[in-house]
UniProtKB/Swiss-Prot annotation:
A Gene Ontology cellular-component term: cytosolic small ribosomal subunit
Protein's job: One of the primary rRNA binding proteins, it binds directly to 16S rRNA where it helps nucleate assembly of the platform of the 30S subunit by binding and bridging several RNA helices of the 16S rRNA. Forms an intersubunit bridge (bridge B4) with the 23S rRNA of the 50S subunit in the ribosome.
Gene: rpsO
Keywords: Ribonucleoprotein, Ribosomal protein, RNA-binding, rRNA-binding
InterPro entries noted in UniProt: Ribosomal_uS15, Ribosomal_uS15_bac-type, uS15_NS1_RNA-bd_sf
Source domain of life: Bacteria
Source organism of this protein record: Methylorubrum extorquens (strain PA1) (Methylobacterium extorquens)
Similarity comment: family membership: Belongs to the universal ribosomal protein uS15 family.
One Pfam match: Ribosomal_S15
An annotated Gene Ontology molecular function: rRNA binding
Protein name from the UniProt record: Small ribosomal subunit protein uS15
């Protein structure tokens, strides 16, 4: 359900704007998207896991807030990111 340290490092490397950039909205949204994808796959086999479903909803809400922030601040970066991640919006 969680992502490995190697996968997280790869996501940071792919979406970061600089060498030590781990907190930009793009990086945070990419990591959240990976976690959401993993949890969605988890629910294919564990449909009644309501405790994890609550966590999933929290992650989706957090990602939505970050996406709204990015859209409000710089829409070009927002459009590029949702296209790159394959998020429908």
């Amino acid at each position: 359900m969680s992502i490995t340290a190697e996968r997280k490092t790869a996501l940071i490397k792919d979406y970061a704007k600089g060498n030590k950039d781990t907190g930009s909205p793009e990086v945070q949204i990419a990591i959240l998207t990976e976690r959401i994808t993993n949890l969605t796959a988890h629910f294919k086999t564990h449909g009644k896991d309501n405790h994890s479903r609550r966590g999933l909803l929290k992650l989706v809400s957090q990602r939505r807030s970050l996406l709204d922030y990015l859209k409000r601040k710089e829409e070009a970066r927002y459009r590029t990111l949702i296209e790159r991640l394959g998020i429908r919006r």
